[in-house]
Structures are given as C-alpha cells and as structure tokens.
Amino acid sequence: MSEKPKYYITTAIAYTSGKPHIGNTYEIVLADAIARYKRSQGYDVFFQTGTDEHGQKIQEKAEAAGISPKEYVDQISGEVKRIWDMVNSSYDNFVRTTDEDHEKCVKKIFKKLYDQGDIYKGSYEGLYCTPCESFWTESQLVDGKCPDCGREVQPAKEEAYFFKMSKYADRLIDYINTHPDFIQPVSRKNEMMNNFLLPGLQDLCVSRTSFSWGIPVDFDPKHVVYVWLDALTNYITKIGYDPDGSSELFKKNWPADLHLIGKDIVRFHTIYWPIFLMALDLPLPKQVFGHPWLLQGGDKMSKSKGNVIYADDMVRLFGVDATRYFVLHEMPFENDGIITWDLVIERFNSDLANILGNLVNRTVSMSNKYFDGIVKSTGATGDADQTAIDADLKAVVTGTRDKVAKKMEGLRVADAITEVFALFRRCNKYIDETTPWVLAKDEAQQDRLAEVLYNLTESITIGASLLHSFLPETAEKIVAQLNTTLRDFDDLDQFGLYESGTKVTDKPEILFGRLKAEDVMPEVEKIQAAQKAEFEAEQAKLAAVEGKAACGCGAGENAADSADLEPMDIEAKEEITFDDFEKLQFQVGEIVKCEAVAKSKKLLCSQVKIGNQTKQIVSGIRKYYSPEEMVGKKVMVLVNLKPAKLAGVLSEGMLLCAEDAEGNLALLTPEKPMPAGAPIE
C-alpha cells in the first residue's frame, strides 16, 4: 500500500487582542473545509492554527483589564480555541506563541540570523501604529494616519535590531515570477510586486525596547523580538523546526502546502516570511492564499467600530452548520463578502430549509408512507420521458464530484458548495417531474414509485458525502436518517451503491426549520445593545491607560476638559421667525458607511440612516474624524437641505457640528441613546 501524500495547511494565528468575530472565524471554517476535503481525497493532512500572543497592544489591553499579559492572553486564547471548537474545526495542532518550545526556537532563529549577518543593530525614528504594530514613514501615511487602519500614529524613536530585507529582494522577485501559483489570487501578487517589491524594500525592524511583553533577545534582553519574526515562525517551530536539528514531523510536512490568511496580511506572508525562510535556507510554502474579508453590511467588521457579529451568537441563533454554510457560501474567491442578520435568515430559509432540509424530509417521509421505510431498487424506469428524466438525474449526480474537485483545486470553496446544492436542487426538480404522490395512487406504478424513491435516496447519499467537507454534522445526520454511511470520494461518481432493501429511519428529523425574522431580530437587538455597552466600557479603560479622556455618548473626545474651556461669544445673526425655523427638519441619523472624498483633503462622504431611508451627506470634517471613527455614530442631521454637489459628490443634508475658537469641529450627538430618525425639536 502506497504512503498517503501529505498536505500541510495553516491559518494565520489569531491575535489575542480580543474575542474573534465572525470575519475571523470565517478563516478557520474555510481552512477546515479544505482540510476535510483533502482528507476525503486520501491526503495525510496536518492542519495547524492557534494564537499570536505578544505585542504592545496586548500589554496595554492587559493593563486596562488590571491583569498580567499572560493572564490576559490565557483568557483570549482559551476563548479563541472554544470558538474554533464550537464551529467544528478539525485542526491537528493549536499553537500559542507563548508556548515554551516556540519561544526557545524563536530565540535560536534570531541568534542564527544575527550571527550570519542578516540582522544588525541600529535605531529607529519614525511613526508607529500600536493597533497594527507597524512602523511608517511620513510619506506612507494617508491623511496623516496609518494607511492600514486609519488610526492615529505616534512618533517613536528607539534602539532596535533590523533585518536586511533588500539582501533577498531580487531573489524573492525571481521566485514569484517563476512560481505563478505562489501568491493567490493573482491580484494579491500584482499588489505585492508593484507596491512593495519593485519600488524597493527597506530593512525591517525586528525588535522593540519600548514594551516588555514579548520574547527577549537572548544576547540583548532589553530587546523583545518584534511581532512578525515571532508570529510567522510558528509555522515551522510548532512542527519541530530547530536550527540545531529538526524533527521528523517537520521533515515530513515542510514546506507548507497552503498558508490561508486574510488579504490584509498578505504583505507579511509573501514578503517578510519568504525572506526569513530564504535566510534560514528553508524551502518556501507552496501557496499563500489571501482570502477576502467578510463585511458587515458592506463595511469592514471591526471591534473598534462596534459593528461586530460573533460566531457564538450566530451558532446560538442558527446552529453550527448554518453558520458554516453562510460564511462559506457568501464569500467569493476574490471580492469581499457581505453579512447582515437579514441575509443570514434569508439564506437559511431559501437554501438550508427549503432546498436541503425539505428534500431530505420529503424523501424519508414518502419512503415511510408508501413502503414502511424500505428503499428498494426495482429497475422500473417508466416511459421514455421518465427514462430520460432518470438518466439526467444520474448524470447530474455522478458528475458533481468532479465539478466540486475542480472548484476545490482552485480554492473556490463558495463555488464548490454551490455545485453540491445544485445536486440537491436537481433532486427537488426530480420530485416535481416524477410526482411520487400521483404514482402512489396507481397500483401498477408501485415499482416505478419505489425506483423513484431509491434514486432520490441514492442521490441524497452522494450529495451528503460531498457536503461533509463543508457541513459535517448535517451530512452525518442525513446519512443516519437514510441508514447508510458517507461514501468514499473515489466512489462518488458511481450511482446505485445504496443497498437495496435498506430501511430508513421511521422518525425523520427536520434538519433546518424555517425561521421568521420577527422571532430572530429581537434577539439580535439584545446582542447589539450588549456589545455596544461592552465596547464602550473597554474603550474607556484603554483611554485611561493611554492617559486620554474617555469619550461619552454626547460629550466628544475632550469631554474631560470641557469644564476648562473659556465661554465663546459670537456675532449674532439676523433673527428669524418661528415659521422660518419650522421649515428646517432635524432628525437623529446613524452613520452606516463613510469614506474619504477622493478629490478633497477635507471632505468625508457618509451614508446616514434616517428612519427607513439612507441619505448621502458630505461634510468638511476629515481633519477631525477618520472614516472608521464615523461608522456607527449617532449624529444630528438637517435632513431637508436642498441637495448639492461638493467636490463632485452629491450631498443630501448636513451634519451638525460645534466649532471652537480655533476652528476645530466636533459632531453633535444625542446625550442619550436615540433611534435613527428620531425628530430633533
């Protein structure tokens, strides 16, 4: 018997700055689907995930929580692992960068790179973004803020060790050009080449002295190893790499077959990581796939925006496999996917309840109703039309395996699961074409009826076997109801393997019952209210740690200083009548989306929800608010201002602001929670 081919797949390790949301969870579900699929094909899969637990941001979060960094990451890592387990991920190894073996190996790697001249000591002076753990030059900033997250950056100057990135740049460019599948999708490759590699690489800071929560540099312990040299190396340290002699597990599995990561960290995995590996004289991973984001209503999901959907809330409301189905089905290959609670309910009802759940329930129920649960192949094909219908069903069913395989080889998982559901759709159509309830009334058609139910049962068995990589619990429930087992992948292009005479369950289970939005949405509103309160409390603690005043609901960022401000006198304008005032319509609005206006350095374009409508409003507040900060804010809006174009962009209202003596602006917001659309009187 030949040895199974190996397949080593990894996810990015989750950063332990907080509980992972459904966008983070998507990655582990996607990786799990790929890992399960490869196992079904006969591969010896090693699937690794875990948590990234060092850095300044974590140190500050722990301070805010009043506990040690280790206690903090223990809590968050435990939460990550709980959620990964909850969504039924079949990982083989869960790593933590605080594990002793990882820390020991990172120290060895750092020393090796230093000894061979790839790392040198210098000093850094520039701008630092704490949330992103990234240094930037002035020219790299966007509107004076971090180009990755849009937050404020702080001046930083410190002694540091640097890695000579430029030494390996040409070699990496050549590798990428000669290995077209290395970076996928291709658009990510083009971005890395054109934006980073071809313009030239700067040497990379690989140590810090301004915080202590990290792996100390062995020979210079006031330095801690900077996040990427620590985090990225988990892919080799945790399978047994050692500069002094690596394990059999490492020799078997490296290079990785697939690094599955978010598109926002492609640069680190396709530039920094390959160069580190070249310096260590190790082969590069075969492929790095930068998957798109799952956006909440069209905007990036972020705890800082307070628009987070968590996996455990989705699982509680919809179930594990419904959650898995949604994130796998709604995420395209290259473009960002959209998630809203309404869309989840719609997809649950249309696909899981109507197409799949209804099919299985009808088939099992009819087998019990007409034949006491016995499924028997009689070979009765009926007339020529019915024979053609049977042949078409069998062609679709037996052809699905190869269609799924083609999609999965290209990592087009959403397309693969769509192919499986096309099989189930064909089965539902087959029921309409063969009308078992009509056949049941004709004694002469009993053999034909039995054959129809056999064909359905066989088709569903094949479909469930293909579904198992994506929705494992559901697939197992289906074959249990049919009193059979999941098929081997090699047999999924064959029709007729279901054992004739098998008795299906006499107690069919409804796999997915239809949901009503009016039952689900009140629960969603409770979740959102609790999350908002939790987020605001966390921000207040962090602000205190950073020495900043926390921002109250209507008080603005300088609430703590408001008592010290001098009163302002301004020139009075011409009086207006009450009738004039009544012409103005003011309402509370909620900003659901915001972006900078391309042709202006001052303007932001916001989509503002006001009651049941959404207005586009352009405001000159870009100096004071980033687009990210705007999303989720409740604001006061003049809603009946005549539309006008600002910098070529249509504006349909005005956001109300206060202005101090220096001309600084602050949005006016309700002092207490108010619904979008509430009148201002």
Positions of predicted regions on the chain:
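Phosphate-backbone binding interfaces of nucleic-acid-interacting proteins
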Residues: 545-681
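N-terminal catalytic cores of NTP/NDP-binding nucleotidyl/phosphoryl-transfer enzymes
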Residues: 2-76, 95-110, 115, 132, ...
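Helix-rich, typically C-terminal accessory recognition domains appended to large enzymatic cores
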Residues: 121, 330, 342-379, 396-504, ...
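Intrinsic disorder at enzyme termini
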Residues: 475-580
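Secondary-structure transition/capping motifs at alpha-helix termini
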Residues: 1-3, 37-44, 64-65, 69, ...
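Cys/His-rich short segments
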Residues: 116-169, 173
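A glycine-rich helix N-cap at a beta->alpha junction
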Residues: 77-92
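Structured secondary-structure scaffolds
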Residues: 2-49, 101-105, 149, 155-369, ...
